[in-house]
Design a protein with these regions (language model features):
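Alpha-helical transmembrane segments of multi-pass small-molecule/ion transporters
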Residues: 1-228
Length: 228
């Protein structure tokens, strides 16, 4: 539901900014729940928070290789979905949950160790990726970024109240809702969209990430205070 409301917000912003709604929509409803969201949720709520954050991130990654590619290329390609490892990872995870299967302890421990290692790697990849991006339009980037890092947590908070969530689940949803635009939206746009669109998305990612350095600590404080 949160991603749907993020998308609606993006459509409204892009409509009034007279932008390409299809190709420039992904950065609005696909936040950086992996590179930034998972480590922050781990810091805030420990392994339980990281588990919920990883589940949200898995859904976002799946949407990257389905909806994001469809919007960027304006065509549906089943081959891309079948080639994506995230598709099979989500299927396996859902199967374990649905059939209430218990993962062998040695496998679980191995996956957990790899998961903690990946947190360091994804933070490094975030920094490297940001150095390769540039800001082409400050005004439009600021307006778009407000839609992501300001309206995002507001929508998350509203959904928490609507669904009466509490504890770490509510906190993780609020934190993940406040994340800046995902870098993967830039990479996919670079493959499928015109240069002008790629430049706009690049600008939004950089500016929203910089803005999040101010907004995330505030959201984190609220999450830990009201959803311990």
């Amino acid at each position: 539901f949160a991603l749907i409301f993020f998308a609606i917000t993006g459509v409204i912003f892009l409509f009034f900014m007279k932008k390409d709604i299809s190709r420039e929509l992904p950065p609005f409803f696909l936040p950086n729940t992996g590179n930034m969201g998972i480590p922050i949720c781990l810091f805030a709520y420990g392994s339980l928070g990281m588990g919920v954050a990883a589940a949200i991130s898995s859904l976002v990654v799946l949407l990257h290789f389905t909806v994001n590619i469809f919007l960027a290329s304006k065509k549906f390609d089943i081959k891309v979905i079948l080639k994506s490892p995230s598709t099979y990872a989500v299927i396996i995870a859902v199967s374990f949950l649905y059939f209430d299967l218990e993962m062998p302890k040695f496998v679980l421990n191995t996956v957990m160790l790899l998961g903690y290692t990946m947190i360091v790697l994804i933070l490094m990849s975030l920094g490297i990726s940001l150095t390769q991006m540039k800001v082409f339009s400050i005004k439009n980037s600021l307006i778009s970024s407000v839609g992501r890092v300001i309206f995002g947590p507001i929508i998350g908070f509203i959904l928490i109240k609507i669904f009466n969530l509490s504890g770490y689940a509510a906190g993780v949803l609020l934190i993940q809702s406040s994340m800046p635009s995902a870098i993967l939206t830039y990479l996919i746009a670079h493959m499928y969209s015109p240069k002008e669109i790629v430049d706009n998305i690049s600008s939004m990612i950089v500016v929203s990430t910089l803005m999040s350095l101010i907004t995330i600590p505030i959201v984190l404080f609220i999450a830990l205070k009201y959803f311990p």
